[in-house]
UniProtKB/Swiss-Prot annotation:
GO molecular function, one term: structural constituent of ribosome
Role according to the record: With S4 and S5 plays an important role in translational accuracy.
Ranges of Basic residues composition bias in the record: 113-125
Record PTM 3-methylthioaspartic acid, positions in chain: 89
Protein name in the entry: Small ribosomal subunit protein uS12
Region Disordered, annotated ranges: 106-125
Protein family: Belongs to the universal ribosomal protein uS12 family.
Organism: Azoarcus sp. (strain BH72)
Length: 125
C-alpha cells in the first residue's frame, strides 16, 4: 500500500474506458453517405441475409451499419443518420441506421414498436 507521500508524487491512475462506437466521437448520431448497400450472412448458428450498408461519415470515418426492419429504399449515395448499437451475429457491424430520417423511409405497415422504425401512426378506420 502506498504512503501519502507516494500518492502526492504520483496519484492513482484511472482506468481508461475504450468507446464501443468510436466513429460517433461522443455524439448521439452522425450523418453519412452510403458507399455500398449489400446483404451479408450472420455467424453460426444463425442463417439469414442481413441488410447492411457501408457509410462514409461527415467526420471521414467509414463504417458498416445495419438496416433494421422489413424492406428499405437505400442505394448508393443515399444520405443516412447512424446511431450506435451493434448486431451480435454480424462481426464488424457496430452501428444502426435510423429509420424514417433523411433519405431512409420508415417501415411500411408497421403497427408495433413504430418509433423504432420511423413509422407514422396508422389512420383510424
Amino acid at each position: 500500500m502506498p504512503t501519502i507521500n507516494q500518492l502526492v508524487r504520483k496519484p492513482r491512475q484511472m482506468d481508461v474506458v475504450k468507446s464501443k462506437v468510436p466513429a460517433l466521437e461522443a455524439c448521439p448520431q452522425k450523418r453519412g453517405v452510403c458507399t455500398r448497400v449489400y446483404t451479408t450472412t450472420p455467424k453460426k448458428p444463425n442463417s439469414a441475409l442481413r441488410k447492411v450498408a457501408k457509410v462514409r461519415l461527415t467526420n471521414g470515418f467509414e463504417v458498416i451499419s445495419y438496416i433494421g426492419g422489413e424492406g428499405h429504399n437505400l442505394q448508393e449515395h443515399s444520405v443516412v443518420l447512424i446511431r450506435g448499437g451493434r448486431v451480435k451475429d454480424l462481426p464488424g457491424v457496430r452501428y444502426h441506421i435510423v429509420r424514417g430520417s433523411l433519405d431512409l423511409q420508415g417501415v411500411k405497415d408497421r403497427k408495433q414498436s413504430r418509433s423504432k422504425y420511423g413509422a407514422k401512426r396508422p389512420k383510424k378506420a
